[in-house]
Amino acid sequence: MGTVSSRRSWWPLPLLLLLLLLLGPAGARAQEDEDGDYEELVLALRSEEDGLAEAPEHGTTATFHRCAKDPWRLPGTYVVVLKEETHLSQSERTARRLQAQAARRGYLTKILHVFHGLLPGFLVKMSGDLLELALKLPHVDYIEEDSSVFAQSIPWNLERITPPRYRADEYQPPDGGSLVEVYLLDTSIQSDHREIEGRVMVTDFENVPEEDGTRFHRQASKCDSHGTHLAGVVSGRDAGVAKGASMRSLRVLNCQGKGTVSGTLIGLEFIRKSQLVQPVGPLVVLLPLAGGYSRVLNAACQRLARAGVVLVTAAGNFRDDACLYSPASAPEVITVGATNAQDQPVTLGTLGTNFGRCVDLFAPGEDIIGASSDCSTCFVSQSGTSQAAAHVAGIAAMMLSAEPELTLAELRQRLIHFSAKDVINEAWFPEDQRVLTPNLVAALPPSTHGAGWQLFCRTVWSAHSGPTRMATAVARCAPDEELLSCSSFSRSGKRRGERMEAQGGKLVCRAHNAFGGEGVYAIARCCLLPQANCSIHTAPPAEAGMGTRVHCHQQGHVLTGCSSHWEVEDLGTHKPPMLRPRGQPNQCVGHREASIHASCCRAPGLECKVKEHGIPAPQEQVTVACEEGWTLTGCSALPGTSHVLGAYAVDNTCVVRSRDVSTAGSTSEEAVAAVAICCRSRHLAQASQELQ
């Protein structure tokens, strides 16, 4: 674009307005239908657009995203996310350029908010007709249509989270959470309720949509109900979990319990700015809400988590896969499902708690007694995954107050480690989700003393791959965790194995589907191993008639896991690596057609051993567990037959699954064994004993 000539005549502003309406009546009318209260009208003055001109970025394509739940969409409002290194001044220029180019085409726009501090971008109100234009602007990474989020709520709970050896009335927690501040993003709060008076500071932050319906009556007790109850569950004097924790409330949900993705984003940005201006001790953010899957909301949660903030969220009350919702699907967030007094999944009418691989653990979420906004001394019972998330936020506050230096990865591993295990009736979940859903109910630790001297591991499942022949699935550990082993699982049994590989400077677990397969899962075993030095050793397929072998040849390195994969088709028949525990325990042995991979690690005092359990006749499931004091790091099957569906770790147990033997046509020679690699750290154990 050239500069404006000094001889150019400028038209009067009223005439420009009239011309604009005549040239673009459809766009202007559509935008007025969505919001008739625009505060600013931007005209495409040629000189302004010339000043904003920037060279477009080549080789990059911005993408558009919107909520998969049509009733929750909010067309006309968009979050424009810019590339990571974009400065605030560039964000503002990009927003002005969008306004100028839109006005030139006859459309009105309004910049509602410019993000900085958490992620670069801006929130804009505009016609959907402008999306193509906006996607071509410099610095734009992606655009997401705004959508709705909802509150997830429709004294047995304190008893349930108390360690088994104690009664709730005699249990003294290691810390009441006094060093931790909990941010609550919810409705407004009745801060003078006796349960939370003096414990909750109501901030001046508010970003909520108008209530649906012109006759909606805003009763104070109704507007404060959800937030007041959850604040009481987290830190209430009588019914709270972390009675010493302080709280700050941000209002992002209206009186109907409804908010927006953009409002939640601005709330998270508010927390990040507060953290930068006035750094305090450990922070926990409670997000007792859920909306459709949102890339931008998950990205914001990731940024905040990597800044040291612990985020806890509700899994959702839709009796559905939690991975379809945000922020529940964000890997950096601790996602909580709900159980009842019998430790069974909560049913809410025709719906109920969400489930699946994106859930980290469950917690009490049915008929929870807490503060009521009806009066300053009233109590009420509420149910939902919001209440479950509030319990875990309280437990997290207590753990962080006792050990303020805990990272998110360390906190998550402790929450999983101290949970009650295998108490949920898995039959409640859909069949294809049972193996993916953790059978864990949150509990307070009996003591934080000595917890730091244990080897903690957890199992992370990937999303299901596609059914195509070359489809793969990838499972990743958190940045502070070590990937110690990799396995795969296919319900059809048709897979080409798995392997660990470097991606972005971090090891990941990749599983391979096979011809005729229905898809595959990758399963990572993610552990906390301080000062670890880990590497992968690979042996290519061997010559005919020979087995493939690989071992840990570096001094001081021990075997933590074995995996294998086929580069060529073997009709979908995966034959996993065979561990030989006798003679050379640091060795993986496999079939000659496969590449074999050994995960070898060195860490202070680390020692590992192989444990095998086989059954002479074929079984649908074979297990082997590590003894107390040892932690499962690797899990595989021996030998590999066409009937093996895969191997995976459940807590400290290695599980090998096979197809139904009654229909698989198996023979007695095809017995399957589960092989576990169990590790511990002598260095950590000795340090723990010295402290006791």
Swiss-Prot record:
Residue numbers of Phosphoserine PTMs: 47, 688
Residue numbers spanned by region C-terminal domain: 450-692
Residues covered by the Peptidase S8 domain: 155-461
Keyword rRNA-binding in annotation: no
Domain Inhibitor I9: 77-149
CDD domains: PCSK9_C-CRD, Peptidases_S8_PCSK9_ProteinaseK_like
Annotated GO CC locations: cell surface; cytoplasm; early endosome; endoplasmic reticulum; extracellular space; Golgi apparatus; late endosome; lysosome
PTM section of the record: Cleavage by furin and PCSK5 generates a truncated inactive protein that is unable to induce LDLR degradation.
Keywords, alphabetical: Apoptosis, Autocatalytic cleavage, Calcium, Cholesterol metabolism, Cytoplasm, Disulfide bond, Endoplasmic reticulum, Endosome, Glycoprotein, Golgi apparatus, Hydrolase, Lipid metabolism, Lysosome, Phosphoprotein, Protease, Secreted, Serine protease, Signal, Steroid metabolism, Sterol metabolism, Sulfation, Zymogen
Reported cofactor(s): Ca(2+)
InterPro entries, per database record: PCSK9_C1, PCSK9_C2, PCSK9_C3, PCSK9_ProteinaseK-like, Peptidase_S8/S53_dom, Peptidase_S8/S53_dom_sf, Peptidase_S8_subtilisin-like, Peptidase_S8_subtilisin-rel
Modified-residue entries (Sulfotyrosine), positions: 38
Domain text: The C-terminal domain (CRD) is essential for the LDLR-binding and degrading activities. The catalytic domain is responsible for mediating its self-association.
Similarity comment: Belongs to the peptidase S8 family.
Protein name, per record: Proprotein convertase subtilisin/kexin type 9
Organism (species): Pan troglodytes
Source taxonomy: Eukaryota, Metazoa, Chordata, Craniata, Vertebrata
Gene encoding the protein: PCSK9
